[in-house]
């Protein structure tokens, strides 16, 4: 799969290697952008645009990886659970706030990362396409 289709298209399947390459590219991109924009304290288009590009790219990579595991893109909504746990932690105190705000989001994100990045692909063609592909730089 050509790199820009792998990073920005919601169609097709992406294998584990492609998932980790895309995840790593987004991480490096955000790391570079964070160091460039670190002095800016006001949210402007220049500071928000890299975040939106990376968010869109990560969403496309995750959805294609879900397709490779023979799952629907609707399952990406499970990412709302850690966010809701974090928000709910502000309404509690003590150990419950720590459990909801730190432990649950980390646990859920770890399980999701294992699901998407470590488990094998669906071996046969499915409704989302042929066997999952990785990145090509052409």
Question: What are these model-derived regions, one by one?
Answer:
Residues 1-25, 58-74, 113-138:
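Membrane-interface extramembranous regions at the lipid-water interface
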Residues 29-57, 79-112:
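Membrane-helix interface segments in multi-pass membrane proteins
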């Amino acid at each position: 799969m050509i790199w820009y289709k792998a990073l920005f298209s919601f169609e097709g399947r992406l294998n584990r290697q492609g998932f980790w390459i895309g995840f790593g590219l987004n991480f490096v991109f955000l790391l570079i952008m964070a160091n460039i924009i670190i002095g800016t304290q006001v949210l402007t288009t220049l500071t928000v645009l890299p975040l939106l590009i990376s968010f869109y790219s990560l969403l496309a990579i995750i959805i294609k990886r879900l397709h490779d595991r023979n799952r629907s893109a609707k399952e990406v909504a499970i990412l709302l659970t850690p966010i809701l746990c974090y928000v709910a932690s502000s309404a509690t105190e003590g150990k419950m706030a720590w459990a909801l705000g730190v432990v649950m989001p980390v646990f859920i994100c770890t399980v999701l990362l294992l699901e998407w990045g470590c488990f094998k692909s669906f071996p046969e063609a499915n409704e989302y396409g042929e066997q999952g592909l990785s990145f090509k730089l052409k």
